[in-house]
Design a protein with these regions (language model features):
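Conserved beta-strand positions
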Residues: 63, 146, 173, 313-315, ...
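Structural recognition of alpha->loop->beta junctions
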Residues: 184-206, 371-384, 458-473
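A structural motif corresponding to the C-terminal end of an alpha-helix
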Residues: 94-110, 305-306, 376, 380-381, ...
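Flexible glycine/acidic-rich beta-alpha junction loops that bind and position SAM and/or redox cofactors
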Residues: 68-72, 178-187, 272, 322-323, ...
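Radical SAM [4Fe-4S] cluster-binding motif and immediate context
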Residues: 48, 59, 239-441, 446-448, ...
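Acidic, low-complexity intrinsically disordered segments
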Residues: 4, 29-307
Length: 623
């Protein structure tokens, strides 16, 4: 048995070396061109007669998910991505719905092209020109939608949008950044770019109608729905009970390391008030759920017709979905039909913390709910639960208003006693998930006000003892649209306004106890402490030998641990990276701030100079 384990460890070490080569080898040039997808209707759509009428007015809609710029200003691009983007597939579904409903009646058809820049290919000025020329050649109209744009992707998305706009192409932008940061909306509108604020389901029909009439507006936001509280005020959010489910595209899935994995959101919103998080301010604190039967039917179809075996429920907190029990019960039936089906999800600490009745506790409805949830999740095929624990220090948790991770009694306790209670709570979370065979993935932030230079080392050491399987570490970042961003901006504590650096691995704030160097060292200490070489070997041996988890949980932990081990050492956060980087040296960032980008792309050099490679490199204007 010992020899077998040694041989197994050697195998995984060799595999790790190969993965290191894939992760760390830059390929200069030789970039595969992205295949512009003309998304065909799904089987259901074909059955309902959604085929393109001939001849008809055709609008080719590009949904583009921008990448971001790396440290040297090059666009991040990988041969394989790590996770399909849910926004792209959800938006494609809206076009299909329009075609099913209106194509024949209105003699209008929407062609859909989805382009995920991180794995489909870098969009160069030549690409933009070719897209317009191809549309003209095919006799179709062109509409560009920058989709699901996060703050660290905004500079890249803005640059692409402005280049399309310079050629006279109508452009829209949506996502968390524009939904949470009015200043960027104002800038885009000044440039003639439409901003779509909030969720698109209730807006898309009106957007297309306005476009077809030649009256595309500069600003769209949700007007019909329910009122939901945020961290600051109230917003209107749409009900999603009957919202369209994402379109599965087999071509898109081949761009990812695991092409049998996809994503879906079954609910939206988050009831909590964490000050660093933008979810509650964009989607509200009122939980809304899709119809469970529709979700289960979609998953079954994905398994049967697209070979899907792994699913990521991208709900911000699936445990708080009002329909989780019905969905999990349905997924249990899917698991019986497709034994290889499994999924991961994001939940809060209470999802498993009270699945056991600890000494001195009396069983309550909270315990029964937690126990029911963990048992159903495991039976339905859950292999990993992502839990945002964020800090071990109760003072930090209270600062961030993340009260769900603390114990009410700790307000009367000394700090060390309160900290011990927090750690004990996290230990219960992990133990209860492991008891039902589910692995755990923690999210942890470094740089709260009560953190010091040793916060990374202490975090790694403690999280190892608690027995979290995977940990994603993040540098505390003032994301636009959050209470933290408003607070730090008012205090003058934001030292870096380049949105490209809001990726949770750059220092962008002043800190009373940490300078930039010690903060980055704490970040490195956390990663190298948790993902050390001894721990890599230990994980290979103990996880492969069993250790209380399901087979898919063990495989997932092995894959992710090795991937995280090397990805961090290559200077890339695993959640925003990919496999096998490809470097396009001919495409490099020129503009930093919004005004500089406007002068460059709309008022200045235009494409001739850009294509000749002229520019001023990295300018230092404020964002």
């Amino acid at each position: 048995m010992v020899l077998f384990l040694i041989a197994l460890a050697a195998f995984f070490v060799v595999a790790a070396v190969i993965l290191y080569w894939l992760l760390g080898t830059n390929r200069y040039g030789g970039d595969r061109p992205a295949q512009a997808l003309q998304l065909t209707a799904s089987k259901g759509a074909l059955a309902q007669g959604a085929l393109k009428p001939e001849p008809c007015r055709t609008v080719r809609v590009y949904f583009i998910k921008p990448s971001r710029y790396d440290e040297e200003g090059y666009v991040q691009f990988f041969r394989y991505g790590v996770q399909p983007n849910n926004s792209l597939t959800a938006l494609a579904a809206l076009n299909e719905a329009f075609n099913r409903k209106f194509s024949a009646e209105r003699n209008v058809h929407l062609d859909t092209v989805i382009w995920d820049e991180i794995c489909d290919g870098v969009i160069s000025p030549e690409t933009i020109t070719a897209i317009k020329e191809k549309a003209h050649e095919d006799g179709v109209e062109l509409l560009i939608g920058m989709a699901g744009v996060q703050s660290n992707q905004y500079p890249r998305g803005r640059d692409i949008a402005l280049q399309f706009k310079a050629l006279g192409v109508p452009v829209m932008m949506g996502g968390f950044h524009v939904s949470g940061y009015p200043d960027s909306v104002k800038f885009l509108n000044e440039c003639g770019i439409t901003a779509v604020v909030g969720e698109a389901e209730n807006l898309w029909g009106q957007i297309i109608e306005d476009y077809l009439r030649g009256d595309l507006q500069l600003h769209y936001s949700v007007k019909d729905g329910i009122r939901a509280k945020t961290g600051r005020d109230d917003i209107i959010v749409p009900l999603i009970t009957d919202a369209l489910l994402p379109v599965l595209d087999d071509r898109y899935l081949t761009r990812f390391f695991n092409e049998q994995m996809t994503t879906i959101d079954t609910s939206r919103g988050c009831p909590f008030t964490c000050s660093y998080c933008s979810v509650k301010n964009v989607m509200g604190r009122t939980m809304r759920s899709r119809e469970p039967n529709a979700v289960v039917t979609w998953v079954r179809d994905a398994c049967r017709n697209h070979g899907i075996q792994s699913l990521f429920l991208v709900d911000d907190d699936f445990f708080r979905s009002p329909r989780w029990e019905e969905i999990l019960t349905g997924l249990i039936e899917v698991k019986k039909e497709f034994p290889k089906f499994s999924f991961m999800m994001q939940v809060d600490v209470d999802a498993s913390c009270y699945a056991n009745v600890a000494e001195g506790e009396t069983e309550t409805a909270k315990h029964r709910r937690s126990q029911r949830f963990t048992e159903l999740a495991a039976a339905a095929g859950c292999y990993m639960a992502f839990i945002g624990i964020e800090s071990l220090n109760p003072d930090n948790l209270n600062f961030a208003t993340k009260y769900q991770n603390t114990d009410d009694r700790q307000h009367k306790l000394k700090l060390e006693d309160a900290r011990a209670r927090v750690i004990n709570k996290y230990r219960r979370v992990v133990d209860n998930w492991h008891k039902v065979g589910v692995s755990t993935h923690a999210g942890y932030m470094l740089g709260f006000p009560f953190d010091g230079p040793d916060c990374g080392r202490i975090a790694a050491q403690t999280l190892r003892k608690i027995k979290f399987d995977i940990v994603s570490f993040f540098i505390m970042t003032p994301l636009p649209g959050t209470e933290d961003q408003v607070r730090y901006a008012k205090e003058g504590a934001i030292i870096d306004w380049d949105f490209n650096n809001l990726d949770s691995q750059h220092v962008t704030l002043k800190h009373d106890k940490l300078d930039r160097s010690s903060w980055m060292q704490a970040y490195r200490d956390a990663f190298t402490g948790f993902y050390s070489i001894p721990r890599l070997l230990h994980t290979v041996l103990t996880v492969a030998a069993g250790r209380q988890m399901s087979a898919e949980s063990r495989r997932s932990v092995l894959r992710q641990f090795i991937y995280y081990f090397f990805s961090y050492r290559q200077g890339r956060h695993p959640m925003v990276g990919g496999i096998w980087p490809i470097l396009r040296r001919d495409i490099r960032r020129i503009a930093i701030g919004d005004d500089e980008a406007r002068r460059l792309y709309l008022c200045g050099m235009r494409f001739g100079a850009i294509l000749r490679g002229e520019g001023n490199g990295f300018a230092a204007s404020p964002a």
